[in-house]
Amino acid sequence: MFYVFFSTWEKNVDGYTGHSGSFSSIHANSCRDALRRLETMVLMGMDMPLGAIQGLIASSVDILIHLGRCLNGERKILEISEIKDYSRTEYETHTLFQYDKDHGLEIQEDLFHVEKLKDYGQYEKYCEAVKLFREGRAE
């Protein structure tokens, strides 16, 4: 249990302190549930106010990707969400992509926070990837 907590908190601290490229995984039923699960894991190993934990999570986690297993056994991206904002007790997220069983992964909204992509010189690549996806040419 301690390893899970330590690993989770260290990943969160890495993201919060400006280390680019942090990546972690967590078991949850949706993107929104992943945020609550992360809060719970941190609370299990540390006596810290929930609001402080939520603030750190909101400022260090940018994108959430929910993978799931379909009825045929294939794993698919079911949802990609972005943390748009945080207000004292609630994360404001919006769904960028959502899986539809008849149409596959569909764009729902455009990325809100593009500053980091621009800072790291990746914004043009992101725009090109979205363009290809919309045209149905993305792999």
Predicted regions and their residues:
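NTP-binding/hydrolysis catalytic cores, primarily Walker-type P-loop NTPases
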Residues: 73-139
